[in-house]
Amino acid sequence: MDITLTIFAQALAFAGLIWIVATKIWPPLLQAIEERQQKIAEGLAAADRSQKDLAQAQEKVNEVLKDARTKANEIIDQAHARANQIIEAAKLEAIAEANRQKELAQTEIDASATRAREELRKQVSVLAVSGAEKLLKREIDANAHKALLDELAAEI
């Protein structure tokens, strides 16, 4: 065999091999590579989206926590205000009750004083009548009258 023919046959075989590889093997291989690249790109995009979603979720969590703290502080402030209102109402109620008790006591004191005055008037009138009787029974004498009046004054 001639060397030219051998080179030509090998060139033809090589060309056939290139054609078979280019038509039968290369397209599925390129398709597999492209699919793999696409999957990798999708994975990277998903990772980026996940990181963004995580960052957004973290921001939202921080915002919700901030709102919760604000609301908790508002609730605590409202509770303190309500407690102060209740304390003030209790103080006012206690003052009103004390005033009412004071008025009742004052009314009772006034009534007792009035009864005591009436009792004193009765006793004074009895003493006056008794003194008048004694004066009328004795002779009219200035010294005796003075002694009787002093005695009445001591009794009063």
Curated annotation (Swiss-Prot):
InterPro entries: ATP_synth_B-like_membr_sf, ATP_synth_b/b'su_bac/chlpt, ATP_synth_F0_bsu_bac, ATP_synthase_B_chain. One of its GO terms (cellular component) is plasma membrane. SUPFAM superfamilies: F1F0 ATP synthase subunit B, membrane domain. The keyword Zinc does not apply. Keywords: ATP synthesis, Cell inner membrane, Cell membrane, CF(0), Hydrogen ion transport, Ion transport, Membrane, Transmembrane, Transmembrane helix, Transport. GO terms for molecular function: proton-transporting ATP synthase activity, rotational mechanism; proton-transporting ATPase activity, rotational mechanism. It is found in: Cell inner membrane. It is a single-pass membrane protein. The chain crosses the membrane at residues 3-23. F(1)F(0) ATP synthase produces ATP from ADP in the presence of a proton or sodium gradient. F-type ATPases consist of two structural domains, F(1) containing the extramembraneous catalytic core and F(0) containing the membrane proton channel, linked together by a central stalk and a peripheral stalk. During catalysis, ATP synthesis in the catalytic domain of F(1) is coupled via a rotary mechanism of the central stalk subunits to proton translocation. Component of the F(0) channel, it forms part of the peripheral stalk, linking F(1) to F(0). Belongs to the ATPase B chain family. F-type ATPases have 2 components, F(1) - the catalytic core - and F(0) - the membrane proton channel. F(1) has five subunits: alpha(3), beta(3), gamma(1), delta(1), epsilon(1). F(0) has three main subunits: a(1), b(2) and c(10-14). The alpha and beta chains form an alternating ring which encloses part of the gamma chain. F(1) is attached to F(0) by a central stalk formed by the gamma and epsilon chains, while a peripheral stalk is formed by the delta and b chains. This is ATP synthase subunit b. It comes from Xanthomonas oryzae pv. oryzae (strain KACC10331 / KXO85). The gene is atpF.
